[in-house]
Swiss-Prot record:
Alphabetized GO MF terms: signaling receptor binding
Alphabetical list of SMART domains matching this protein: Cornichon
Protein name per UniProt: ER-derived vesicles protein ERV15
Record field: transmembrane: 8-28, 56-76, 115-135
């Protein structure tokens, strides 16, 4: 792995952190809706504003690894990429304020699953970043 691999995994790590923060924000919003701290219209406005950028960011991360030849890392990202693409294609990525209470449980489960995925992938990217850094240092020494 070269310096390109190091910068690629650092970029992936940072962008993955943004997606994780987005999922944490969604989790907090769903909890606020359950506790009646926020109304359904405001929740839908906030979630809908960030749902497409989150999918685009995930697609961008996947494309980065695909175009740089990291097939295994790309394949790790394919399930969430396919799920996001399916939601956008079927136009189910936007929440409706009149429907949110019926879908709240499913939305929370989806949010927790994505958050778990992003956390696992965070540690994978971190590990690969450290190994790339060590390989880069070993190449500089020799």
């Amino acid at each position: 792995m070269s310096g390109t691999g190091l910068s690629l995994f650092v970029t992936g790590l940072i962008l993955n952190c943004l997606n994780s923060i987005c999922q944490i924000y969604f989790t907090i919003l769903y909890g606020d809706l359950e506790a009646d701290y926020i109304n359904s219209i405001e929740l839908c406005k906030r979630v809908n504003r960030l749902s497409v950028p989150e999918a685009i960011l995930q697609a961008f991360i996947s494309a980065l690894f695909l175009f740089n030849g990291y097939w295994f890392v790309f394949l790790l990202n394919v399930p969430v990429l396919a799920y996001n693409a399916s939601k956008v294609y079927k136009k189910t990525h936007l929440l409706d304020a009149t429907d949110i209470f019926r879908k709240l449980g499913r939305c929370k489960i989806e949010c927790f699953l994505k958050l778990g995925f992003y956390l696992l992938i965070f540690f994978f990217y971190f590990y690969r970043m450290v190994t790339a850094l060590l390989e880069n240092d070993a190449n500089l020494i020799s």
